[in-house]
Amino acid sequence: FKRPDLSAEEFRDYYESRHRVLGEKYLSPHALKYIRRYPILAGDGADTPGFDVMMEVWFDNYYSMEAAMADMSAEDAQRELAKDEEQLFDRDRTQSFIVDECESDLDAEENDRD
């Protein structure tokens, strides 16, 4: 969640111009992808999203993720990240999850329909 005193535009601008760079610094040796997804309203009847950004980091394997987390847990990294996050996030409301992905092969589904 963004800090309440920031507009959505200010939040996104800071994230993409400053905080993203820190993410890249610590993630680039280990991660395959570093993605930020910002919610948009999809029209009439759309719910207001309960978050300001969904950040995804893709790793080749669990060991790569552990290596990235170790780099980001180092004292200097923690200090640098925390200082920047205070400019951007309501840190008490930030949530993190590790998930397992299941992907459908839609090309195979299409071939089954023929």
Regions found by a protein language model. Give the residues of each.
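Macromolecular interaction modules
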Residues: 1-114
